[in-house]
Structure formats: C-alpha cells, structure tokens
C-alpha cells in the first residue's frame, strides 16, 4: 500500500491552480500566520531564515525553508533586508508569490518592484502605490488631494537638523520626528521644550536606517493625549475598495502598540463614519490595491487627522478577523492572484462586525525595568486556550533561546466575545493561564493595564502608559514551582550549601506528628478543634500589668518552653526551620496550653533565618502565631541593639519592637550584654510604647558565691533595683553559661523574692555543667514564678534543663499546670527532629563542669566549637576554652552574652590561631591588628562595662585609631530615615512592608542577600527539611504545599552528564506530571570561560548595559570628564537604539567595550572615578 503525504491532501481543494507556491519574506509569527492560510488555500509554502534563526519555528512550519546567504554574510537583521538574495532564492525554487509580512521589507518599493520584474507575484500594493503612501510625506500630499485633514508637519522629508529647528520655531513644541518609512515605533522621537532636537534627530534617523534601510525623516506637530484609530482596508485590482471597520490602537509605549481593540469602544458614531469614509476615499484616490491600513489621530474635541497609510498587513489584523469573520491574509493572496472583491463575496454593505476583540502582545520585556527586553532560555512555556482565545505565536516553547537580535514578541493573544467587558475578562483569564518561565515577560503589566479603570472605560489615549505610573504597581507572577526546582537541582548537583552542615540527616523520612489523647483516651483532632485557652487570653483581655499580677498569683511555678528558640540554638546551631515548627505547632497549642510562654523568636534566630535558612523571620512569626493563638510568645531583645550585634538609633529599636508586637510577640525579654542600664532602658521603653509585656533582665555571670568575684549578690540586687525602677512587668534572670549553682540560685532568688514580693521572677539557664535541673528546682522552691525548660529530646548539654526531669523534681511540692502525657507525646516528634538535624550537632558527649572556669554561654559553646573546627583549631579545643577565659579577663571580666560573648570568642580564637598568651597580647597590644568586634568593644559601641574598661590595655588596642565613647552609643547615632529606607527598598525589591524595613535596619547586607536568594529560589521554607538539606534520590517523590489547596508533586528523574564546555549538568524533574529540565553549574568542575564583569546597578560609578544587544557607539574614553545624564554609549537591541547615560558626575576610569561589541544585560560598560568634572568653555 503506497504511503501518501499529508501535504498531498491539499490537492483536493486547490483554489489557485498551478501558481500556488508562496514565499514569506519575514520571520517569527507572521510567516506562520500566512503559511496557515496558504495551506488552507492548497499552496506550497517556503520560508527563509537567517543563520541566527536556523532553529526558529517559522522555518519548521513551511514546506520548504532556505537560509539567506552564507554564515556571516549578513547581520541577523540584514539577512531579512537582502533584496537580491531573497529574490534569488524565490527564483531558484520556482516561487509564484512573495508575501512580505510586516516590518523588514514590507514597505520597500524597490523590493516590490524587483519582485514583479522577476516574474513573481507581489502580495501587496504595487511599488508606485507604496511610494505614494508608504512614504509618510507623500501620504500627506495624498491627503491634501483627497481633502482629508492632517496634522501640521514639514511639507517633505528633511535631511538636516536646521530644517527640524525651523519647523519647531514656526509651530512650537512639542513635535515628533518620525521615520518616513516603517513603523513599530522605531525611528520616532518626541521632542518637548528644552529637549535636545539635534540628538533626537540623529537617533531617529540612525534607528530608521538600521530598521528599514532608509533614514529619511519628517517632523510634525505632536498632539497630546489623542486616540490612535486605524481602519483596515481591502482593495482589488479593479478599483473596488472596502473597509473592515476600525481598531483602537491607542494603548502604546514608545509609539509601539501594546494592546489593540476592535472596534473602538468610545468613538462617537459620526466620528467613526467620517473616519471610515475618509479611509476609503484615500484608498481610491491613490489607486490602492491589496490590504492596507489608514491611520488617524482623534483629539480631545473628536477631530480626526490622517497620519499615514500602512501598505501592508498589520500585527493586529487578527482582531479585525475576529469581529468580521474575514480572513485578511486569504483575501490578500487571492486579490494578488487576480480575484475581485465581489468574487470574494466582499461587499461593503454585507461586511458587519460582531462583538469585540482585544489583542495583547506578550513580549519578553521587563516592565519594572522600563520594558527592558530580556534574553535567555525559556524554561517553561504553557499557553492559554479555550473559548474565544486565539494565539498567534512564533518562537514560543520550552527550550527557546530568546536572542537580542530580533523583536521581543513571543505570542499575540487575541480574545473575542459579545461585549467589551466579556472580552476584557476573557483576556485577563487567558493571561493568567500563561506560564512562561526563564525570561521576564510583560504579562504582569498587561494584567495591571486591563484592570485599570481607564482601560475598563475604554477612554485611553496614546500616552496613557507614560501618563499613568500606577500601571507599574504590578502583581508579579510568583514563579514558585520553577524557583524551587532550581534550588532542588542545585542541591542535586552540588549538595547542600547551608553553612555549618556536616554530612546528611540521619532521618530518612519526615518526622511523624504525634496524636494527643484526652482524659478518656480519645484522639484530639488538633487541626479542627480550637486549643484550650491559655495565658495569652489573659494578656489579651486584661493587658500586661494584670497579666503579670495573675502570673505572680499563680499557685505554683510556670514553665516556659525554649525548644522553638534557645534549645535548638544551643544544640543545632539555630538551624531548625519554620516548616518543622509549623508542623508541630497545632499539637503544641493543645499539649502546652498551660505553659507560661513559648520562646520562639528574636536573638540569633532572626538573622540565622535569613542568613542560613533563607527564610523570612517575620513570616515565621506570623505563621506560628496563627497556629498557636493561646500561648504567649516570648522573644529575646538585645536592648539598644534590637536583634543586631551593635547599637542602633533609638527610632530603629522603637520601629522594630512595634512590628514584633504587631506580628505576634507578647513578652519581650529585654537584656543588655553588659547590664548597661542606659542601653537596657532603650529596649524597655520601646516595649512599653508598643504595648508588650516587659521582662527586663539581669544577665548572670560566673560563680556568685566565690569570694572576691566581681559579680556578687550585692551587684545583682543593685541592678535589679534599678530595673524595677524602670517599671518592668517581670524581672528576668538570664544565666547564659549555666554557672548558677543551686545554692546561688536559692540565695539570689530568695533575696529578690523577699525584696519584691509582688513582682514575677523568671529565670533562664543552660545545662552545660549538668546542674540546671537542681538549680531551677532551687529557684522554684525559692519563689521563682517562671523557669525555662526544653522538651526532653532537646534538653541537656548546652540547652535548657529537661522538662520531665524538672517536673519530677518538683512533684509533690509545686504545681506547674502541665499534662505530662502530652509532653511525652510531643517529645516523640522532637526525638525524630533531632535526627533530622543531626548534621548540625556539635560533638558534645556530656556536661562540661569546666564551664564554671571558662564561663562560655551555652548557645555560644556549640557555635564556638564549630568555628574552631572550621578554622582548623578543632584539635586545640581545650586550648580555645582556656584562651576564652584569658580573653575574658583581658577585656575586664565582662558579662558574657551576645554580643559581648562574641567579642570574647573572637579574641580567644585570635589568640589561639596566632599562638599568643594573655601576656603576649598585653605586651603587643599596640602593634596587633585585633578583630573588629574587639575594636568595637573598646571603642564603646557595645556599651559601658561594669567597673569600666581595663587601662592601659584599652588605649593600646585603640592606638588613636578610634574614639573612646563614654556615653550610650545610640546618642551618637543619627535617627534612621525610615521613609527613605522604605522607598529605597521598594525601588530595589518591589513590594515591601514595615517588617522589611525593620529587617534591613537590623542587618542590611543579610537582608539584601536574603532578597537575592528569594528572587532566585523563592520561598524555601515550604520545602520538607530532608529535601532542603540533602539531594533527592532518583525517582524520589515529594509533596510541597505552597499555599492552601496548592500542592506540588515533585519527582527527581535524572541528573545528566557534565557538559564539559559549559560546566553544567541538566537535572530532570517531573512536576505535577510534566517534565521540567533545569541547567545547573557543577561547582566541583573548573571550566575556563571568558566572562565580562557585571555592573552593580546600585553603584553610581558603575555604568552597565540595561539589556543584551550590540554597542553601536562608545561616546567616552578613559580619562573623560562627564556629567550626570551625559551619554556614554549607544546600544542597539531588539531592533531599537537607546542612549546609555551616566548616572553621576565623574571621570572615566575604564571603558570595557568597543563599537560593534555584543553585550549581555548588566555587563559593565564603563567604570567611573568619583571626581567632579571640570567646567569647560565653549
């Protein structure tokens, strides 16, 4: 049985006879559009393509395809302007028709003439008609003959700047310099009063010459806020002309249409009729043939002015087809073949419109960066569809590489329906349905535009986009799935990059959430039933003062659980993620409903969340708060430091605390690392202003009972007295190193209870020495109202004492209000969690009684051990602990808690790594380069230590390099300009809130890095922890809930071989049943590649390429003195030119590019030196 080709089926409906081979002299979506109609007409189709377009879709849609010239013979654009080469291809392959599409040679009369002379049928108006209307100046003369109104302009083309200036002098500003040939917004420049006419003229002519091969321009009066209305025309070879009604093309940017509507929604009937009549009149006057478009402007008084006739098919012809049902391309081809309009059934009185249609051009442009065209590889492409949705696309599919050589349009989306509003909503739906990943698109902008009240009313004008900055307040596509895949792919290739991780988690599955049981043994449904009321309800109903009073009146000792903060800080390097806290949160809300509080925020957890876990600490707080509404949340606040490591302006602390209170923190444990009361008061006052519970805290240090100790009972009672005078709700005692022995606990708490019988006392310790259970038992028996504990599996060593051990110690003496069975059920979860985070465990085997000598805080002990191992000092751990003790005394025997503990630790490691004794340090102090933290301490930036700074050691260390502060550091700091910070963050990172401002104030660089990480990988907190910390195994499937009701099913399919040229591997995933491919650089491989330096777009001395393209002209050289706004280079990209200007005054230090060089987006072009240019005389 013989095999028939699909193409042979066309012979059954051949309409054009033997002449049926058509070549489209164009690229992208328009050849595809034409090929489809040609195939319907049983024609054979031929595509042409440049070397750069050899993978383009239009080449594949044709029956035959031929490259234009040899490799390197033409530029990417120049290939499609090579008239003789294109005609030669047509002749060689027996082409009968040539369709020019739009752009390129579509309005070139020379091309039309040569096509006809070559014996090929030209689909379009003849050359003489193109000359009479395609040239905008000739078209004005035509309008005068037809008595159709036009906008005042030069009578003919101009060749010099002086002619442009003469027109400006006669008619005034504003004017527009326009290319006499072509369209699409290229070769156009609006010049307003004060603008540089000469520069605009030069750019317009240069751009026109590049785009259309002809730089001729003319000047005309520029109308403010007009509508742009165009009429679709069809004319045959027998003098018949019809119009297919109008399109409203007023929504434009850079004179290039963005959204088109047919018919015009708000055009009065009499104006529409006059425009349609004039359009037909113009076509008949010039003897027009084939398809064309008459374009008009309509001013605010509904006066219309003829602009030009475009002698070609338009990009937006699709929406006219949708409302009339007429295939314009089919009409073009058949008219060129000799058919008359009547033969095609096209009578004016029979042509009607039905409903409305809207077209949106989806481009790879970034609206947030002034519509900068984006380049790169499309990773994901999923298009819209359904009733009333038409797509006309070109190179739009997964894997497409978007180059800088051609127009940035991916696809035209046209929607049609019975009313304007129905179509608008349909278009919104269609745009939302698109999924395009890997390159930026203008879809977020289009959605904002379609929902703007002006667009809804249909009253837009040609500069509507430029005049409406609200359009740029866009809701961006989140691209969550693709970003997560990039992270998982990176981990699959390179492993985890989380600092501090050693090896992989020991737990190979997700921890199981335990079931709680009520008194009757029934399982409690913690997700459906509200948790029991707790102490937070008392706080919310009665306020901080009454809350504190009721805590004091409680008949027993309350417990605060530190598992969510200090416990994992002390044992697991603060690495426990929001995902795992949120998983157990509903269960915790039921199990620990009677708990005084959960310590869950602040301190090191704040910056570690951003710095290492790539999470937003505010999102963690809000999420946990929503899941645990009944138990108070407590945070750690470092007085005048907030959660930073040094003092900040007072207004930054006030601002931060307010955000913390508003987002869920109830109790603020406020401390100062030196017990500096002036520093402490800043935090206390901030909490009072915010309406939180103040737990002003005394930091405990050393062995209080040892004779001669600096920090004795009298010292603590004196500090406590001053804290009480500040008006604290609760008095906190913070034993950071766990050096409070049971006897000291009994004495101190007993003394405080006797002195302050009505004040709640809250004690915190660490179990580093193994005595914490005994110490906290002593505190409780001595009258402490609250003591800190941790879940059993997260207790002991450098963490807090075990809750069950403490309950056993207090049993029969003091009530805690805790359900022991519920605690055991919770503990099962945390036992598994400990295994999940085993890769962050410190190598501590048991208690360290030496803590009474070195006094290293519990949270720091594990971190210091890790740092020592990272610095190669792990084998010298005993020496490090000894050095820590010596460093403490060098600094004056200070209270050690973040950030002062870091100062001691840095100095200790400095001593060990440089093999220095304390005597060496004292002797060489005036010549050693100490760590910055030590310098900050001695300058006084952390505060004033009890007993003062040690002299002359302080002076030797500072060596007049730094001042000696004697007052509170915050008094020396200027208040932050919060409004300016907010505005700067908004400009850099988009949608920000007050919490972002607070994060930036605390940790500017960390916040910036976090935002960059989130932009790259999205919200990583949704990933299961095993997948976050370790590579997926092949065929392993995980579920990722990105929001309620949206779950991603991700399976790793394979990791590809190394591409030795690029150093990349391809990682294949199955995402919700759809294959995704991610390219990842293998960082274990060294690949020699030539890369250009990238500009820091926030550095005014860096001038970078705003988009990928070709440098047309470099206007400066090394040593040039330039001013802000002065052009430094001209870039050609996406068939348009733009001037790159200097963002600041300066002198050119280096130029990194030359004329004709290709550049990528953000490539560093020019580097400036910070020097004000010298004024020169003319």
From Swiss-Prot:
User: Where is the PTM N6-carboxylysine found along the chain?
Assistant: 734
Stretches assigned to the Biotinyl-binding domain: 1094-1169
Keyword Translocase in annotation: no
Q: How does it assemble?
A: Homotetramer.
Location in the cell: Cytoplasm
Q: What does this gene product do?
A: Pyruvate carboxylase catalyzes a 2-step reaction, involving the ATP-dependent carboxylation of the covalently attached biotin in the first step and the transfer of the carboxyl group to pyruvate in the second.
Q: Where is the ATP-grasp domain?
A: 140-337
Pathway where this protein functions? Carbohydrate biosynthesis; gluconeogenesis
Q: Pinpoint the Pyruvate carboxyltransferase domain residues.
A: 557-824
Major enzyme class = ligase
Q: What PROSITE patterns does this protein map onto?
A: ATP_GRASP (PS50975), BC (PS50979), BIOTIN (PS00188), BIOTINYL_LIPOYL (PS50968), CPSASE_1 (PS00866), CPSASE_2 (PS00867), PYR_CT (PS50991)
**GO BP:** gluconeogenesis; pyruvate metabolic process
Quick one: which residues bind ATP? Answer: 136, 220, 255
Protein name in the entry: Pyruvate carboxylase 1
This chain's source organism reads Saccharomyces cerevisiae (strain ATCC 204508 / S288c)
**What InterPro entries does the entry give?**
Aldolase_TIM (IPR013785), ATP-grasp (IPR011761), BC-like_N (IPR005481), Biotin_BS (IPR001882), Biotin_carboxylation_dom (IPR011764), Biotin_COase_C (IPR005482), Biotin_lipoyl (IPR000089), Carboxylase_cons_dom (IPR003379)
- List of residues binding a divalent metal cation: 566, 734, 764, 766
The protein's required cofactor(s) are namely:
biotin; Zn(2+)
């Amino acid at each position: 049985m013989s095999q028939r080709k699909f193409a042979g089926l066309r012979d059954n409906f051949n309409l054009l006879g033997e002449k049926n081979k058509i070549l489209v002299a164009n690229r992208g979506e328009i050849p595809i559009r034409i090929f489809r109609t040609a195939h319907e007409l049983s024609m054979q189709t031929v595509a042409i393509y440049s070397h750069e377009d050899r993978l383009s879709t239009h080449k594949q849609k044709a029956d035959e395809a031929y490259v234009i010239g040899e490799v390197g013979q033409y530029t990417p654009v120049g290939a499609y302007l090579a008239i003789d080469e294109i005609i030669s291809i047509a002749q060689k392959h027996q082409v009968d028709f040539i369709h020019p599409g739009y752009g390129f040679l579509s309005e070139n009369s020379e091309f039309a003439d040569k096509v006809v002379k070559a014996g090929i049928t030209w689909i379009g108006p003849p050359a003489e008609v193109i000359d009479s209307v395609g040239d905008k100046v000739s078209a004005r003369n035509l309008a005068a003959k037809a008595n159709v109104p036009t906008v005042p302009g030069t009578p003919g083309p101009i060749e010099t700047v002086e002619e442009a200036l003469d027109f400006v002098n006669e008619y005034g500003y504003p004017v527009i310099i326009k290319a006499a040939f072509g369209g699409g917004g290229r070769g156009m420049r609006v010049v307003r009063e004060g603008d540089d006419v000469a520069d605009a003229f030069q750019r317009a002519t240069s751009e026109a010459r590049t785009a259309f091969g002809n730089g001729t321009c003319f000047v005309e009066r520029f109308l403010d806020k007009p509508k742009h209305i165009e009429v679709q025309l069809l004319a045959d070879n027998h003098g018949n002309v019809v119009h297919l009604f109008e399109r409203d093309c007023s929504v434009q940017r850079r004179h290039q249409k963005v959204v088109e509507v047919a018919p015009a929604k708000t055009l009065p009937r009499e104006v529409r009729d006059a425009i349609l009549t004039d359009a037909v009149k113009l076509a008949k006057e010039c003897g027009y043939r084939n398809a064309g478009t008459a374009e008009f402007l309509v001013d605010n008084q509904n006066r219309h002015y003829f602009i030009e006739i475009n002698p070609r098919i338009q990009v937006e012809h699709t929406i006219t087809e949708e409302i009339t049902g007429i295939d314009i391309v089919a009409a073009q081809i058949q008219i060129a073949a000799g058919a008359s309009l009547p033969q095609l059934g096209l009578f004016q009185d029979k042509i009607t419109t039905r409903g409305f249609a809207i077209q949106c051009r989806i481009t790879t442009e970034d609206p947030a960066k002034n519509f900068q065209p984006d380049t790169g590889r499309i990773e994901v492409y999923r298009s819209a569809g359904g009733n009333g949705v038409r797509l006309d696309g070109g190179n739009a599919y997964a894997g497409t590489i978007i180059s800088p050589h051609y127009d940035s349009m991916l696809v035209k989306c046209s929607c049609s329906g019975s009313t304007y509003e129905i179509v608008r909503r349909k278009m919104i739906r269609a745009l939302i349905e698109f999924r395009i990943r890997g390159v930026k698109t203008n879809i977020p902008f289009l959605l904002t535009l379609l929902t703007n009240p002006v667009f809804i009313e249909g009253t837009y004008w040609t500069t509507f986009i430029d005049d409406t900055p609200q359009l740029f307040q866009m809701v961006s596509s989140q691209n969550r799935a693709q970003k997560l895949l990039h992270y998982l792919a990176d981990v699959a290739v390179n492993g985890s990059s989380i600092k501090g991780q050693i090896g992989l988690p020991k737990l190979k599955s997700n921890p199981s959430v335990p079931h709680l049981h009520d008194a009757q043994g029934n399982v409690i449904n913690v997700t459906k039933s509200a948790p029991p009321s707790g102490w937070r309800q008392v706080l919310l109903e009665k306020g901080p003062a009454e809350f504190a009073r009721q805590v004091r009146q409680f008949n027993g000792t309350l417990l605060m659980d530190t598992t969510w903060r200090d416990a994992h800080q002390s044992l697991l390097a603060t690495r426990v993620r929001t995902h795992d806290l949120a998983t157990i949160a509903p269960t915790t809300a039921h199990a620990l409903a009677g708990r005084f509080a959960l310590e869950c925020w602040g301190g090191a957890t704040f910056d570690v969340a951003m710095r290492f876990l790539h999470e937003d600490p505010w999102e963690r707080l809000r999420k946990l708060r929503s899941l645990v509404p009944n138990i108070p949340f407590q945070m750690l606040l470092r007085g005048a430091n907030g959660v930073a490591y040094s003092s900040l302006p007072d207004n930054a602390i006030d601002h931060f605390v307010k955000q913390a209170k508003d987002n869920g923190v109830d109790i603020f444990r406020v401390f100062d690392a030196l017990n500096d009361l002036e520093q402490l008061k800043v935090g206390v006052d901030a909490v009072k202003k915010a309406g939180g519970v103040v737990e002003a805290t005394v930091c405990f240090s050393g062995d209080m009972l040892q004779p001669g100790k600096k920090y004795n009972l009298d010292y603590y009672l004196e500090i406590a007295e001053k804290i009480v005078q500040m008006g604290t709700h609760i008095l906190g005692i913070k034993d950071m190193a766990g050096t409070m022995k049971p006897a000291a606990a009994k004495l101190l708490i007993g003394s405080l209870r006797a002195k302050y019988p009505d004040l709640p006392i809250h004690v915190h310790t660490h179990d580093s020495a193994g005595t914490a259970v005994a110490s906290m038992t002593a505190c409780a028996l001595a009258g402490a109202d609250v003591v800190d504990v941790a879940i059993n599996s997260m207790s002991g060593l450098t963490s807090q004492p075990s809750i069950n051990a403490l309950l056993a110690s207090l049993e029969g003496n003091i009530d805690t209000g805790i359900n022991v069975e519920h605690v055991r059920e919770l503990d099962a979860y945390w036992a598994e969690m400990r295994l999940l985070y085993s890769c962050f465990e410190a190598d501590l085997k048991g208690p360290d009684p030496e803590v009474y000598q070195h006094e290293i805080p519990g949270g720091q002990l594990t971190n210091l051990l890790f740092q020592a191992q990272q610095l190669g000092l792990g084998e010298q751990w005993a020496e490090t602990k000894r050095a820590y003790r010596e460093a403490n005394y060098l600094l004056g025997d200070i209270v050690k808690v973040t950030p002062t503990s870091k100062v001691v630790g840095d100095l200790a490691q400095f001593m060990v790594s440089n093999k220095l004794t304390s005597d060496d340090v004292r002797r060489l102090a005036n010549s050693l380069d100490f760590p910055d933290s030590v310098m900050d301490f001695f300058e006084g930036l952390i505060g004033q230590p009890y007993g003062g700074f040690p002299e002359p050691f302080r002076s030797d260390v500072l060596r007049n390099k730094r001042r000696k502060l004697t007052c509170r550091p915050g008094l020396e700091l200027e208040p932050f300009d919060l409004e300016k910070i907010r505005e700067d963050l908004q400009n850099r990172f988009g949608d920000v809130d007050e919490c972002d401002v607070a994060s930036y104030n605390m940790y500017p660089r960390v916040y910036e890095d976090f935002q960059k990480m989130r932009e790259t990988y999205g919200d990583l907190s949704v990933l299961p922890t095993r997948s976050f910390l370790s590579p997926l195994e092949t065929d392993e499937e995980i579920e990722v809930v990105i929001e309620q009701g949206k779950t991603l099913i991700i399976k790793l399919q394979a990791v590809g071989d190394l591409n030795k040229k690029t150093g990349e591997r391809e990682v294949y995933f199955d995402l919700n049943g759809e294959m995704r491919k991610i390219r990842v650089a293998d960082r274990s491989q060294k690949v020699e590649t030539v890369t250009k330096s990238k500009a820091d777009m926030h550095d005014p001395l860096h001038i970078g390429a705003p988009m990928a393209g070709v440098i047309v002209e470099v206007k400066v050289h090394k040593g040039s003195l330039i001013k802000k706004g002065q052009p430094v280079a001209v870039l050609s990209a996406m068939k348009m030119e733009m001037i790159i200007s200097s963002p600041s005054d300066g002198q050119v230090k280096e130029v990194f590019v030359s004329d004709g060089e290709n550049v990528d987006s953000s490539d560093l072009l020019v580097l400036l030196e910070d020097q004000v240019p010298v004024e020169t005389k003319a």
